[in-house]
Structures are given as structure tokens and as C-alpha cells.
């Protein structure tokens, strides 16, 4: 049986040691609207950002997450990239450079 989608979008979670900087980038530079944050005891704070019909969840960890050495694109499983299709690339690149 195939799944019946309840939402025509993907929600993505990113766990980070650098929550404030990452939140500032997606919220202040890319302009994603922020929904109320959710504290998750023992894990960190989940910051929710609206991206079209999708939600980007930035999990700012309470305790430092071990840094794993890099590898080739397909060398391990997990989220390796996130694509946001936009139509104003030049303006966004200028904002990123200013950030």
C-alpha cells in the first residue's frame, strides 16, 4: 500500500551546535518566518521556520554534538543537502555576502 500524504511538502530537521547563527541565517538572511520555538529537555530547543508548505526545524543542542570527519557525498546516510528553489538568486547572494 502506498502512503497517503497528509501534506504536500517535506519537513526537515537539522541538529546543530551553532543554533543562533544558523537561526539568524535562515530567518534574517533568507527571510523564513519563525514559528514559536519548542524547548525539548535533554535535547535542546527546536526552532521552526516556515518555507512555503514545508517546515525547517533547527535543533539547537543543549550539549555539544560530536563532530564527525567529512566524507564523500554518498559516503554515509543522513541528510546531505537541502534545496530551496528561489527566483531572486542575485539578491539572496548579495545578502549572504553581507551576512
Language model features: what each stretch is:
Residues 43, 64-70:
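A short, acidic/glycine-rich surface segment
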Residues 55, 62-65:
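Active-site/binding-pocket entry motifs
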Residues 58, 72-75:
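Helix-adjacent hinge/juxtasegments
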Residues 1-4, 71:
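A detector for short, charged/polar N-terminal pre-domain segments
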Residues 3-6, 13-56, 91, 98:
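Core segments of cupin and vicinal oxygen chelate
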Residues 11, 57, 85:
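Conserved beta-strand segments that form the floor/walls of ligand-binding pockets within enzyme
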Residues 16-20, 63, 74-99:
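Vicinal oxygen chelate
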Residues 7-9, 79:
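Core-facing hydrophobic residues within beta-strands of well-ordered domains
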